[in-house]
Amino acid sequence: MKTPIRKTHPVMKIANTALVDLPSPSNISTWWNFGSLLGLFLTMQIITGIILAMHYTSEVDMAFDSISHITRNVNYGWLMRTMHMNGAAFMFICMYAHMGRGMYYSSYMLAETWNIGIIIMIATMATAFMGYVLPWGQMSFWGATVITNLVSAIPYIGTDIVYWLWGGFSVGKATLSRFFAFHFVLPFVLIALSGVHLLFLHQTGSNNPLGLNSNLDKIPFHSFFSWKDLLGFAXMILIFCTITLTFPLIMGDPENFNPANPLSTPPHIQPEWYFLFAYAILRSIPNKLGGVVALVGSLIIPATMMLTHKSMLQPMSFRPISQVIFWLFCANFIALSWIGAAPVEDPYITLGQVFSMLYFLFFLTAPMINMLEKKLSLKQ
């Protein structure tokens, strides 16, 4: 029998091993759909972003008007803009769900894949932050000023780095131009990082809900999981289109409808909702350097999870205490996002400090909880 071309062609062979004949555990659930959904939204962001970049002007006097021009005058410009804006939000929803699944089912034990994933998350956050600055509205300008100014907390060289980032002594034309350039380039870096992420994943094979070695029970990715992924695409695109076409601006900030004005500070400066958990942790420390350390720590602390894992079992499916702690962590994550959007006054300051402490305690107490579960299981 003739060998299919997908198995012999030099390029198609790579795609075949990654998407068609990839051996996959037979019992992976819908929670494993979010990886492919992230690929879908990244592709959509790049396509809509390139179209928007054709009409955007990275000049402080024209950036806000060019966004208005895209929305009003360009054919389907309003659709491209709202798709790009809400696509970023949906990408973060999928990313947090993807990471949550990894934490629940102990996918962090695949150390290389997990650590590359954390790098992808930080790079995605940087890309989204720079994109938020581009409309050059009030929240764009002041968000850029406040967040970049945090770098000045670095001893000795911090202030010089901030001026270097800004391209001057304040956020201005040079800042906008370089942020536009980086925002355009970084998604392609994300594609490369995603390729490395998949490369490491395919070296070890996917994790599964039981946390056991599934080499004896593997099935081809196509057609079993390709159809399953398509169902996930259909469901997520339906929700995405409903929001984009019905409530297109629900995830934006009303303050950003005002052009950037360096002489007028908004009453409450806040980033997009998907950064609010980290912003709340930053604000919970009264010291500037301490806040920056806590912010960076909140993003990189998941990298320690494979070091603190002391359980005999991998997934939390069979660890009831860890399950309770994990879902409390999820609730805490949502609470931190709420606090990040609240004004800096009591009781929000105190609540932010409590929730920030609980966020870090989830990671720090993991080995003790694992050992407690081990003792309880051995007693039985």
Swiss-Prot record:
Heme b b566 binds at H98, H197. The keyword DNA repair does not apply. The chain crosses the membrane at residues 34-54, 78-100, 113-133, 179-199, 225-245, 289-309, 324-344, 349-369. GO terms for cellular component: mitochondrial inner membrane; respiratory chain complex III. Its main location: mitochondrion. It is a multi-pass membrane protein. It holds the Pfam family Cytochrom_B_C. Belongs to the cytochrome b family. This is Cytochrome b. It comes from Xenoturbella bocki. The lineage of its organism: Eukaryota, Metazoa, Xenacoelomorpha, Xenoturbellida, Xenoturbellidae.
